[in-house]
Amino acid sequence: MAEQKGMDPDTKYIKLQVVGGEVPGATLAQRVGPLGLSSKVVGEDIKKATADYKSLKVHVQLAIKDRKATVEVQPSVATLIIKSLKEPPRDRKKEKNILHNGSLRMTEVVDIARIARSSRSYSNSLSGTVKEVLGTCKSIGCKVDGKCPKEVTREIDAGEIKLPDQ
């Protein structure tokens, strides 16, 4: 695995996609078993760490050092948007490809952009990251301040909406 800045060379990293608030399935045992860890204990740690994202898909990074695993939750922008819409959890097995029809405030979009900027965004500026988040809002189907996210992007480009520098 490629070394990233700030990563310890003695630590093994495993990335998983799990459903928040649930114990991961058999793939966890296959990934952590050879490293000498109990999949049951690690599964419970993941369940506790992802409790805020109940029934949403979320990425988890396990950092394993000296037969101890630390869990870091890395939610995607889409997961953060759905969480801030505060919709009730759905049965993910029955309902697929759901369009979310809620509306976010622009301040919530900026907050999500700040979170995404720290780990996932490739943009040089906060306004670029906000536009990435607005594109995800469009894909999900939600509105921003009651408007289509594409309209809000045009207003940012035209200078009608002022965004903070950082």
Curated annotation (Swiss-Prot):
<dbReference type="InterPro" id="IPR020785">
    <property type="entry name" value="Ribosomal_uL11_CS"/>
</dbReference>
<dbReference type="GO" id="GO:0006412">
    <property type="term" value="P:translation"/>
</dbReference>
<keyword id="KW-0694">RNA-binding</keyword>
<protein>
    <recommendedName>
        <fullName>Large ribosomal subunit protein uL11</fullName>
    </recommendedName>
</protein>
<dbReference type="InterPro" id="IPR036769">
    <property type="entry name" value="Ribosomal_uL11_C_sf"/>
</dbReference>
<dbReference type="GO" id="GO:0003735">
    <property type="term" value="F:structural constituent of ribosome"/>
</dbReference>
<keyword id="KW-0689">Ribosomal protein</keyword>
<comment type="similarity">
    <text>Belongs to the universal ribosomal protein uL11 family.</text>
</comment>
<dbReference type="InterPro" id="IPR020783">
    <property type="entry name" value="Ribosomal_uL11_C"/>
</dbReference>
<dbReference type="GO" id="GO:0022625">
    <property type="term" value="C:cytosolic large ribosomal subunit"/>
</dbReference>
<dbReference type="Pfam" id="PF03946">
    <property type="entry name" value="Ribosomal_L11_N"/>
</dbReference>
<keyword id="KW-0488">Methylation</keyword>
<dbReference type="InterPro" id="IPR036796">
    <property type="entry name" value="Ribosomal_uL11_N_sf"/>
</dbReference>
<keyword id="KW-0687">Ribonucleoprotein</keyword>
<dbReference type="GO" id="GO:0070180">
    <property type="term" value="F:large ribosomal subunit rRNA binding"/>
</dbReference>
<dbReference type="InterPro" id="IPR020784">
    <property type="entry name" value="Ribosomal_uL11_N"/>
</dbReference>
<feature type="modified residue" description="N5-methylarginine">
    <location>
        <position position="67"/>
    </location>
</feature>
<dbReference type="InterPro" id="IPR000911">
    <property type="entry name" value="Ribosomal_uL11"/>
</dbReference>
<dbReference type="Pfam" id="PF00298">
    <property type="entry name" value="Ribosomal_L11"/>
</dbReference>
